[in-house]
Design a protein with these regions (language model features):
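N-terminal periplasmic accessory domains that precede
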Residues: 111-114, 173-176, 180, 200-201, ...
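Extracytoplasmic beta-strand/coil segments of soluble accessory domains associated
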Residues: 111-114, 146-147, 157, 177-223
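Outer-membrane beta-barrel transmembrane domain signature of Gram-negative proteins
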Residues: 399-413, 420-422, 433, 445-553, ...
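Short acidic/polar hinge/loop motifs at secondary-structure boundaries
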Residues: 217-255
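Short, acidic, small-residue-rich periplasmic hinge/interaction motif at the N-terminus
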Residues: 56-62, 114-166
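C-terminal beta-signal and adjacent terminal beta-strands/loops
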Residues: 663, 738, 788-802, 829-886
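Gram-negative outer-membrane beta-barrel transporters
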Residues: 653, 658-800
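Transmembrane beta-barrel wall of Gram-negative outer-membrane proteins
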Residues: 280-283, 293-383, 388-397, 401-414, ...
Length: 886
């Protein structure tokens, strides 16, 4: 991989001939194009009889037509031989004859199996959302072939269905995924405005190191950077909560480096969210729940419906709402001797979301497609309680400032997809625009300096307007070549991508930053506001084939040019050898790249508590360079993956994947300074620091570390049939993960950039092991899911707030949070064929993290380690759920 400084620092964005004003069709990924819906094509089939699932996959391979089906629906069914000259529909009709299954085709040619009510045999046991079934799903992530199952992939891929998401008892996509996939984690709680956004980590790395796609198209990042400390500090990852769960068909999580395939950010892996494409039917759902402590009541509802549009079109619509009240998990405030400081807990959230996925065939060889999401979210996050003595004439009983966010998040993709371009090329031309726009405010606060000067102060402030946008244009082409010496076709893909990124910080109102600003969090001053842009041009090549019937290989290369960093070239080589149907070995090696986000380069802030102020200086600012900061550089990575895939029994699937990720020039929270040096730097950066604080410190984002993360992922599924007592779908998931600090970079003043606390955030704030065992039992109308998860200990280096080391930035309190076990239970009942009811409990035994030692519990009330990525401190959560399908 090479980085070259560009001769020109700006390149005008490419203008693509894609001007769409109508709704269009969607498909999981361009690389799986089928013949357009309006075209009838006769093909030659030669498929032997066997399991129906294998017959269906053979139809996919020989016709290059995607077929979406749940393995659980075809489990145990036999498929006939399919031979002769037939259309795809005729072949599928033969395969499904007598099975009780039918099929429908959407506008982009994707075929979906469904039960034919009049023919379907009545099962003696109900069908659960089996993990074994999802393993047989044809996947579209990490491959550009049309017939790859999760169990046959060259890299480890988890497939999570919408039903599995719902059965976690949460309407938050991030929280649902974390419950189901041990390789995903999140920090316990963020502070200040960072608490307003959800983020997730994969394999113990930063949220910045996982790429999120929707239907295979790059998703924009949040505009709200996390600056509250911990592993996720400095991250601007994708907020999955902005995508309505009702719109999701399934989610594919690729646990392997994929920068050579998808570009920047895909260092730890890729999360690809596949939207629903049904042209009929739908559901209405409602869920409600509350924590065992009696707070945090939440409720939500969703509607999804599919419509046929004309002869070949479809429109799938989703709408969703959710409201969540705040929680309080604080200890006794040593200043008052009472409980109730609300700053330790979840914020209050109100959220409304919409999504559509639509399309139609224009001609026999041309399709339109389009999909979009829109989310409006308001959040209110309580900050530290302020004493009555501060402003007695305004708040005689004291006050609790609340940071607020009024956020709009939206994304629209539109494209054209066709076949037989210049002969046999399948092609896809698309444009995606996405934006996140949170307006941050402060309520129930004061400007103390203004109050002392004039005797009056506003109580409500506009702190800042943030905006992050991303406009991505793609041209992708694919063709399969028959090569004489190869047993299967050579799949050749190539494409171009142009992307324009923008990050904007708008100043707050005058009194939000005047002379120290609003209490808890001052607003952005004009000196720290601004707008920054970046343009990216890239191209890729992708080859895959079978060298023998058992040995498949794939290689990819990608070149990208950044207007502000120069050029990068990354590659990936993957291979898999199946010794027999029961044993397979897979491996990959790849290089990766991640450019620093525009927010990491340019964001400045100051957080103020009753006794402490902590600032963040923009890494590229003159103020940060006073302290020795340097311009941020791209992060570079090398990934290795070695996996063993075992299918010893027809109902048992096991995958063991060992991995290593080496990161150079990792962007971390470092370069910490305190006292007058920090105050001078903050003032130079346009930040006014309040007087009378016990401690003032500041830091900046920096390429401060080289790290190596290595570990093992284990997944296993097994189906137990209990004759007349139903069946149990077992799922085991485990992640063993460790990150080592290879190099702590040295600052210009000769000091290491990372102190002990910041090193611990990277190396030990995430559990080194997380193991989950799930049993999903079903019989007739009843279903029961029990999930047990073990989290190993986490280690943090905590601040001292009392004693001789109080507020030190060099001496820390070593703290170990012991291993924890969480138990989740859900009981389901199908009242009718359409109505399903559920009641459940997450963390049924009300397990919480260990409490902090008194000397590190800020003012007594902050008695949990909010930097750890282990378990939530909210405790048991009880819920009910109802789904009506039609």
């Amino acid at each position: 991989m090479s980085i070259e400084r560009p001769s020109c620092l700006h390149r005008t964005p490419m203008i693509w001939a894609v001007g769409f004003t109508c709704l269009m069709a969607a498909e999981p990924l361009w690389a799986q194009p089928a013949a357009p819906a309006g075209k009838v094509q006769v093909l030659s089939f030669d498929i032997p009889a066997g399991d129906l699932s294998q017959v269906l996959l053979s139809i996919v391979r020989q016709s290059r037509t995607p077929i979406s089906f749940d393995q659980a629906r075809v489990q145990g069914l036999a498929g006939p031989a399919i031979k002769g000259s037939l259309s795809v529909d005729q072949a599928l009709e033969q395969a499904l004859r007598g099975s009780g299954l039918g099929f429908s085709r959407n506008a982009s040619g994707v075929l979906t199996l469904h039960t034919v009510a009049s023919q379907a045999p009545q099962p003696t046991t109900s069908t659960p959302a089996t993990s074994a079934g999802t393993l047989a799903t044809v996947v579209v992530t990490g491959t550009r072939q049309a017939d790859v199952k999760a169990t046959d992939s060259l890299s480890p891929i988890d497939v999570v269905s919408n039903e599995q998401l719902r059965q976690t008892g949460t309407q938050n996509v991030r929280e649902a995924l974390i419950k189901l996939l041990p390789s995903l984690s999140r920090q316990a709680q963020a502070y200040n405005a960072s608490a307003l956004t959800n983020a997730q980590s994969l394999r113990g790395l930063s949220p910045n190191h996982v790429l999120v796609l929707v239907n295979g198209k790059r998703r924009h990042e949040t505009a709200n950077i996390n600056v509250s400390g911990g592993l996720q500090s400095g991250s601007t990852g994708v907020d999955l909560d902005t995508i309505p769960m009702a719109a999701i068909d399934h989610i594919e999580v690729l646990r392997d480096g994929a920068s050579a395939q998808y570009g920047s950010d895909a260092i730890a892996g890729v999360i690809n969210i596949i939207l629903r494409t049904a042209d009929q039917g739908g559901l209405v759902s409602y869920n409600a729940g509350q924590y065992g402590a009696g707070d945090g009541f939440s409720q939500g509802g969703a509607v999804n419906n599919g419509y046929r549009v004309g002869e070949t079109g479809y429109l799938n619509l989703s709408a969703e709402f959710r409201e969540q009240k705040s929680t309080i998990r604080a200890g006794i405030d040593e200043r008052t001797g009472h409980y109730g400081n609300p700053s330790i807990g979840d914020p209050a959230v109100h959220r409304q979301a919409l999504a559509f996925n639509t399309g139609a065939a224009l001609t026999d060889q041309l399709d339109f497609y389009s999909f979009a999401t829109y989310t409006h979210r308001t959040v209110s996050s309580a900050q530290i309680y302020q004493l009555p003595t501060l402003v007695p004439t305004i708040y005689p009983n004291g006050f609790t400032p609340r940071i607020t966010s009024d956020e709009d998040d939206y994304s629209l993709t539109a494209g054209l997809r066709g076949v037989e371009l210049f002969g046999d090329w399948d092609w896809d031309l698309s444009s995606t625009y996405g934006a996140d726009k949170p307006d941050i405010g402060m309520d129930h606060s004061v400007n103390l300096a203004l109050y002392n000067e004039t005797g009056t102060t506003p109580r409500k402030f506009d702190l800042a307007e943030y905006k992050a946008t991303q406009w991505t244009n793609n041209l992708d082409l694919r063709r399969a070549f028959d090569v004489a010496l190869l047993p299967k076709p050579l799949n050749f893909s190539w494409g171009l991508e142009q992307r324009s990124d923008l990050y904007k910080v708008g100043a707050g109102d005058y009194y939000s930053y005047y002379n120290g600003g609003s209490k808890a969090l001052p607003g952005q001053a004009p000196a720290t506001a601004g707008q920054w842009t970046r343009d990216v041009l890239g191209g890729y090549l992708d080859l895959s084939t079978h060298l023998t019937e058992q040995w498949q290989v794939a290689t990819a290369a990608r070149y990208e040019h950044y207007s502000d960093f120069g050029s990068t070239t990354n590659g990936k080589l993957s291979t898999r050898y199946d010794f027999n149907p029961q044993v397979g070995l897979r491996a990959s090696v790849s290089s990766g790249f991640r450019a620093p986000s525009l927010a990491q380069e340019n964001y400045t802030s100051l957080g103020v508590s009753p006794t402490i102020a902590t600032g963040l200086l923009a890494a590229n600012s003159a103020a940060a360079k006073m302290l020795g900061a340097e311009d941020l550089k791209p992060e570079k990575s090398i990934n290795y993956n070695l996996g063993l895939v075992l299918n010893p029994l027809s109902d048992l699937n096991i995958a063991i994947d060992a991995y290593q990720i080496t990161l150079r020039d990792r962007i971390v929270d470092g370069g910490t300074y305190s006292g007058q040096q920090a105050i001078d730097a903050l003032r130079a950066g346009g930040i006014s620091v309040p007087a009378g604080l016990a401690s003032v410190s500041t830091h900046y984002m920096t390429n401060g570390a080289d790290t190596r993360t290595h570990g093992v992922d284990i997944t296993a599924t097994y189906l137990t049939r209990l004759d007349g007592w139903g069946q149990i779908d077992w799922r085991l998931g485990a992640n063993f993960n460790r990150t080592k600090l290879l190099k702590n970079h040295i600052g210009s003043d000769g000091r290491p950039l990372l102190n002990d606390q910041q090193q611990a955030w990277i190396t030990s704030s995430t559990p080194r092991s997380q193991v989950s065992l799930e049993a999903n039992w079903s019989r007739d109308k009843w279903g029961l899911t029990v999930r047990e998860t073990r989290y190993s200990k986490t280690i943090s280096e905590l601040d001292y707030y009392t004693g001789p080391n109080a507020y030190s930035t060099t001496e820390f309190n070593h703290f170990e949070n012991s291993p924890k076990y969480l138990t989740d239970i859900e009981l389901r009942y199908s009242a009718t064929r359409q109505l399903s009811l559920a009641v459940g409990a997450n963390n049924v035994f009300d397990v919480k993290p260990d409490k902090l030692p008194a000397e590190s519990a800020y003012l007594g009330f902050n008695h949990y380690d909010t930097y750890a990525s282990q378990i939530s401190f909210n405790g048991a959560f009880y819920y009910v759920n109802a789904v009506y399908s039609f």
